[in-house]
Amino acid sequence: MSDAVYGWYKSFNAAHGMVMSFLKFGVLATLGEMLGLRISAGVYNRKGFGVLSRAVVWGILGMGINMAMIVFSKGVPQFMEYMGMADASAIINGDCCLDKLWIALAVSVTMNTIFAPVFMTFHKITDTHILDCGGSLRSLITPIPMARIITHLNWDTQWNFVFKKTIPFFWYPAHTITFLLPDEVRVLFAAILGVALGVLLAIAARMK
């Protein structure tokens, strides 16, 4: 990437962080789901899959992820200082060192333990709703029948694979790396992980 392009990215990202989060996740996480469909069904798209609806939903979810990353990356170091670790807030934004690694791990574990299960369940609900609407854009304006979808979710897969396996064995280390990166590229890296998420969702789908 040229210095000019990276400079534009940094300035636009700093001024319009939520817009960039919408675009990053809307594009990259949707591509990840298309890759997941390719793994599970042999095609990148099919009738009823709802690529555009998924892109919009992922964009909105991406803004929520950006918010969560800000809240936890600021709040966890503050709590660590409250518990006695000096300068945790400065260390997480400084050069890479062992202390920064531990803080990044703490941020990742806290965020993925508290936020990720709710996020993953809500994503599954929206995904089911899009499929129930035949992939149509009307899924974006049709009320989600929350009680019905939650009742019929495959909680065995959600708990035993999505929560118990992907969170500790993939998302804890993946987001530890994320929080070691400079602030302006964390959300971009998290969006790139959406490709990996698509693969994981494909594996979960095969476990039904």
Task: Give the location of each predicted region.
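Juxtamembrane/disordered regions of integral membrane proteins
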Residues: 1-208
